[in-house]
């Protein structure tokens, strides 16, 4: 079943129907209730395995349904990052982030950092505040072991990972930024559900 060109799901306990884009119950006993969003990062298996070497993987199976078989992200055209702050959403289109991979932003009263990795073709989002201090981030010359550029904060010169939000060297080494709720999404799908939401670059 589709709603605004997006899949609907149902729960087995109440048979309520849910919209996966917004996490809201669309119909049924739980109509109007919202699920809690969890941050979702799309990254390469190499990046993930290096960060979490003990990761276990469920065996896959080939599907004969119309969904087909996922063969990896080959393009970012039409994609963006949906960032949710205090129940409000903002879209950061990947096309705009290609031109400006590090964005120091403020949205819904919160200082936000959005970082796009050209190599990984994905983005992450973090709070820029740390222990009462507001940090401003820039692209660093240094790279991680996978060739991805690292970040540098302008206040202490510490070097940060775009993927984990952790300071890997400098005065703030070991510190970690608070991860925001975000997930990659088709730009058109975001606009269909969040018609009045702000869009970075517009």
Range-by-range predicted roles:
Residues 1-202:
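Mid-to-C-terminal functional-domain signal that highlights helix-capping/loop sites
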